[in-house]
Curated annotation (Swiss-Prot):
It comes from Brucella melitensis biotype 2 (strain ATCC 23457). The keyword Protein biosynthesis applies. The lineage of its organism: Bacteria, Pseudomonadati, Pseudomonadota, Alphaproteobacteria, Hyphomicrobiales. Keywords: Cytoplasm, Methylation, Protein biosynthesis. This is Peptide chain release factor 1. Residues 283-309 are annotated as: Disordered.
């Protein structure tokens, strides 16, 4: 068990009480909004800290009652019976507080840019990319998130060679960030007369949507080209010079948008470029922070095979945490919480272990 930082807990309790007091003194609207936001952020952890404090006090009282020879025998017996249950509750609360005190990922509350690209497997890979996009659409709908299409390159037999969308709502990136990687599918294609199982794959990238304040892009660092959209790769064919290509010169990152509005294409391309640059900085910082460590949920490498969807067996397996669920049909309908929650829990366990190793 990692020792809880009592000083930090006391500071949070003191700050929370101060916020409550200030909110009760009818501050101006701007101040109230800021206080309410901080109040909301602290509410869960402060609630658990208070529960833990009460449980510890209860355990102390029970222990004193048990050890006091002058206490009535029946009361001492009751204390002996109840103390183990309270100690169990304390252990659970300590774990809860530990998790709530973990360093927050600054991007967790951000919206996300979801990119899905067909990989190996030809036509079947494009169909699978489409299935994955619909899976995430349904998951987003269940969460009350908004999905907006940015661009799509359709496959020759359906699905998508590439599809990019924004996902907006509460806690989007915190829930979707572990979806990045290679998703593999094993199934019999509809076009397969012999009934043979084919294996194909699609790559998913989930990027936190970056604001201007998150990443600076200097005008001299980008080159913007406009061109006639040719419709290649399944893009819509445009008859005007509306396609926009933005190149970030220092990194070589290139983003192309080829929808009908040049103005919208430029804005969308900048949105994606900003997200990719921000993601690159996050990946670099994470790599430097933990060069010698690879968390149990995987390295975050986009080329890492993270999950297999086996249709004949009706199972989905996440290879990072060795979790297999035999409810593939429901997963494809957007029931991702069991997978997502297990990945988040595993990540938190890895962070706690890392903190425990620190001197």
């Amino acid at each position: 068990m990692i020792a809880l930082p009592q000083d930090r807990m006391d500071q949070l309790l003191k700050r929370f009480s101060m916020i409550e007091s200030q909110m009760a003194n009818n501050p101006d609207s701007d101040t109230y909004v800021k206080l309410a936001s901080e109040y909301s952020e602290l509410q869960d952890v402060v609630g658990k800290i208070r529960e833990l404090s009460d449980a510890r006090m209860e355990a102390s009282d029970l222990a004193a009652m048990r050890d006091d020879a002058s206490t009535d025998a029946e009361m001492r017996a009751l204390a002996v019976e109840e103390l183990p249950e309270v100690e169990k509750r304390i252990a659970v609360l300590e774990q809860d507080v530990q998790i709530l005190l973990l360093p927050k990922d600054a991007a967790d509350d951000k919206n996300a840019i979801l990119e899905i690209r067909a990989g190996t497997g030809g036509l079947e890979a494009a169909l699978f990319a489409g299935d994955l996009f619909r899976m995430y659409e349904r998951y987003a709908a269940e969460k009350g998130w908004r999905v907006e299409l940015v661009s799509a390159s359709e496959g020759d037999a359906g699905g998508y060679k590439e599809i990019i969308a924004t996902v907006s709502g509460k806690g989007v990136f915190s829930k979707l960030k572990f979806e990045s990687g290679v998703h593999r599918v094993q199934r019999v294609p509809e076009t397969e007369a012999g009934g043979r199982i084919h294996t194909s794959a699609a790559t998913v990238a989930v990027l936190p949507e970056a604001e201007d304040i998150d990443i600076e892009i200097r005008n001299e660092d980008i080159r913007i080209d406009t061109m006639r959209a040719s419709g290649a790769g399944g893009q819509h064919v445009n008859t005007t010079d509306s396609a926009v290509r933005i190149t970030h010169i220092p990194t070589g990152i290139m983003v192309v948008q080829a929808e009908k509005s040049q103005h919208q294409n430029r804005a969308r391309a900048m949105q994606i470029l900003r997200a990719r640059l921000y993601d690159m900085e996050r990946q670099k910082a994470e790599s430097e922070r933990s060069q010698a460590r690879r968390s149990q949920v995987g390295s975050g490498d986009r080329s890492e095979r993270i999950r297999t969807y086996n249709f004949p067996q009706g199972r989905v397996t996440d290879h990072r945490i060795n979790l297999t669920l035999y409810k593939l049909d429901r997963v494809m309908e957007g029931e991702l919480d069991e997978l997502v929650d297990a990945l988040i829990s595993d990540h938190q366990t890895a962070l706690l272990a890392e903190l425990g190793e620190q001197p």
